[in-house]
Amino acid sequence: VFSLFLSFSSIMNPFDCPMVSRRGFLAQTGLGLGGLLLGGAGRAGETSPLIARAPHFAPKAKRVIHFFLNGGPSHVDTFDPKPLLSRYAGQLLPGDYRRTERKTGVAFPSPFQFKKYGQSGLEISEVFEKTAAHADSMAVVRSMYAQVPNHEPSLMLMNCGDSVQARPSFGSWLLYGLGAENQNLPGFVAMCPGGMPIKDSENWQAGFLPGALQGTFVDPQYREVDRLIENIRSGHATVSTQRRQLDLLREMNGRHRDSRGADPRLEARLESFELAFRMQVDATDAFDLSREPASMREMYGDTVHGRQTLMARRLLERGVRFVQLWHGAGQPWDHHESIEGGLRAQAGQIDGPIAALMTDLKQRGMFEDTLILWGGEFGRTPSVELAEGGASKLGRDHNHYGFSVWMAGGGIKGGQVYGATDEFGFKAVENPASVHDLHATMLHLLGFDHEQLTYRHAGRDFRLTDVSGEVMQSIVA
């Protein structure tokens, strides 16, 4: 949405005008903690949805970072070891284990070794060996399940709590409940290197919530702030001129609303203009990794995933509430074939950065109030996927009946496993956990009763967890 901000030829980059300091920028624009939150805020009847608010009760976590492995990571190759698959190698699995989206064949043992880590003895695959150093801080939920084995609805369910209807995303609900801590940065940032995941910006949409609560997309394949957030700066007007133009837009939008009714899309676009305007100073600082010590940049790694994870930490410590790190455009974890090479490569891209983030947060005293979530939209089958002619593709099909996520940090009791899939890893059988249960647990850690965090729309109260959801109390510290 930020590419829309400077499509007005006269909205301009203050850095191309006589240089303006941060203090001067805020003074000229009336921004900052005591100033305008949104260009027209302060006018009669207008309030900002970004004003900071208290949760329902004392939170254990203040912020969230979500590592989203889009495509569906295989749980039986990462955090849910199933040694019995080796005994059945080359044989059809007993029971009802062939109800899969595509044709699958015999049992497919994991090509990766699992080891016990930490005092807890948590079993983790060799592909996440560096992350496993933090095993005693992690709670692995091995009994997740979704509704269908398709990417699009499962992405919507995991992100927005509904696989069918367009609903606000988790980050938008969090901003709705808490407001923004830093008014000059987006409260919700979604990073995806190389483009968009499937369903594009619907994954971080505000839905029927105010447009200011939508996620801000950043492409971390770039290093320059002008490319990280497209058109965040321009070259056609002074700061004061930009402010007057945005005020004019807001006035025109108000007239349109008065005569034709509110249009959420128009409001969302204008809010994106306002936020982009405010970000011109703070975003430059937050995304400038050269300000980090060389040792810190080396710890995270000079790779796209290392850089985006370090950017995420810089955003979190500057008050961003929710940062979602997608692995890449499309569905990179969709390992229908050649899973051994593909999964090893992709796990290797994020294993080091995840471990570095956890170490870094602990050193900074941020780990205890930062909730970390790792996972995808579903898991994968314990049986091998077959090609049209019946040959093995050496990969796994989609599996929504059972998969794993893990959490760490803010309010999580680490070094434990919640729930279980069956002996082959096909279906959640012990303490099955729905996506609504996951969302309810996360909201609880952030200080919210998920049943009370509601928004009135179309004549009824909506919530992220719809009409279900139970907190997984045993993993709450």
Where are these regions (language model features)?
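Ligand-binding pockets and gating/stacking loops
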Residues: F2-A477
